[in-house]
Amino acid sequence: MSLIESIRKQVTPIHPEGYVFIASFGVATLVLGSFFSPLGWIGAFATAWCAYFFRDPVRQTPLDEGLVISPADGVISAVGFFPPPPELGLGVEPLQRISVFMSVFDCHVNRAPVAGRIVKIAYKPGLFLNADLDKASEDNERNGLVIETAAGRFGVVQIAGLVARRIVCFVRQGESIGVGDRIGLIRFGSRVDVYLPGTARALVTVGSKAVAGETVLAELRAGANRRAFKSS
């Protein structure tokens, strides 16, 4: 194994979406530091934080059927039944929803909670309220995906927040995705909601910590054997 390969295995990858931001912070650091060294140190800290924010670590994703995996890093902020956003076309009856709130310190790369085919992508402009508020689901800017599976349709909604002002979607309508695949990113603090079909049973509670691509949020059948994994 070469030295470069060894370093790559030890260093957490940076998502390409962050390159322009990291480069901008780096240039600003050099310019400010040339005028006043304390500003250079501040800029260096900001550059390091930006690189940390856009980190994209490899995750060990359970592959067993019947499991719903967290789409985001963060804290479970809601578990309950809520009407899905109308633009998703999932009906007007309340569906079970699990919300994951991401702070500015969490990894913000979002992943598919289940494997399936993306049958709809719906973007809706809106406000930039605190993403931890209940009304953020209705009022904030958001981007929703509907994933069709053999067990039913799942809704995944990326919600912008007070600081987050840019939702990035990596996938296209009609595309087939695997569980744990990268589906998008939200810059600088936000929330992801997962709407589950009626057969799902939540396995997490409010306040629980979630890891994108790894934490099991719910199961579609009892007693799923969690033995198979993939690195993603």
Curated annotation (Swiss-Prot):
The active site is at 190 (schiff-base intermediate with substrate). The gene is psd. Binds 1 pyruvoyl group covalently per subunit. Is synthesized initially as an inactive proenzyme. Formation of the active enzyme involves a self-maturation process in which the active site pyruvoyl group is generated from an internal serine residue via an autocatalytic post-translational modification. Two non-identical subunits are generated from the proenzyme in this reaction, and the pyruvate is formed at the N-terminus of the alpha chain, which is derived from the carboxyl end of the proenzyme. InterPro entries: PS_Dcarbxylase, PSD-A. One of its GO terms (molecular function) is phosphatidylserine decarboxylase activity. It holds the Pfam family PS_Dcarbxylase. It is a peripheral membrane protein. Keywords: Cell membrane, Decarboxylase, Lipid biosynthesis, Lipid metabolism, Lyase, Membrane, Phospholipid biosynthesis, Phospholipid metabolism, Pyruvate, Zymogen. This is Phosphatidylserine decarboxylase proenzyme. Belongs to the phosphatidylserine decarboxylase family. PSD-A subfamily. Its EC number is 4.1.1.65. The lineage of its organism: Bacteria, Pseudomonadati, Pseudomonadota, Alphaproteobacteria, Hyphomicrobiales.
